[in-house]
Amino acid sequence: MAEQDQNTQQAGGDAPSFNLQRVYLKDLSLEMPNAPHVFLEQEQPQVEVSINVGGQRLAETVFESTVTATVTTRINDKVLYLVEGTQAGIFELANIPAEQMDALLGIVCPTMLYPYLRANVADAITRTSLPALHLAEVNFQALYEQRLAELAQQQGGNNNGSDSGIILPPGTTRQ
């Protein structure tokens, strides 16, 4: 019986493992360069939103994944407010096949972090006493696929099948 338990533990030691260890707000800034004059404006503001994904290896099986949102709201040429926030998470990824690693870091991790970022950005904007702005849902798989297509186009498409097209975060290497 003890031998069976030991065999089960050994087999489980090689099983793929994906765990979220911690979620934290890495950076949040809000600027209102034209306050208080912007409170007198009656026009509808123009909103620009930019979303970026990043990551880095912290240890052999530990990665930091980040999602950054930059929201710039303008009325004519005046900046109403500028909010930039970075939500981060520490993930443990063990025994994950190399061909799946980039997709986990580029799609799954950001998808888990984004709701926290949305809430933090919305809270910051609400504190300006201006009308609330809630960021729309983001399809991180589509962003990931777009990034892969852009990289393939930059490389001129002369892949020759020798590379899988996997993009790893800075500081990581393929196993």
Swiss-Prot record:
Q: Which SUPFAM superfamilies match?
A: SecB-like (SSF54611)
The UniProt keyword set, sorted, is: Chaperone, Cytoplasm, Protein transport, Translocation, Transport
Q: Which residue stretches belong to region Disordered? A: 154-175
Where it sits in the cell: the answer is: Cytoplasm
GO biological processes: protein folding; protein tetramerization; protein transport
> Any signal peptide, and if so, which residues?
none
This molecule's function is given as: One of the proteins required for the normal export of preproteins out of the cell cytoplasm. It is a molecular chaperone that binds to a subset of precursor proteins, maintaining them in a translocation-competent state. It also specifically binds to its receptor SecA.
Complex formation:
Homotetramer, a dimer of dimers. One homotetramer interacts with 1 SecA dimer.
Kindly give the PANTHER family that the UniProt entry links to this protein: PROTEIN-EXPORT PROTEIN SECB, PTHR36918
Name listed for the protein in its UniProt record: Protein-export protein SecB
Q: Which organism is it from?
A: Bordetella petrii (strain ATCC BAA-461 / DSM 12804 / CCUG 43448)
The major lineage groups are: Bacteria, Pseudomonadati, Pseudomonadota, Betaproteobacteria, Burkholderiales
Q: Which gene encodes it?
A: secB
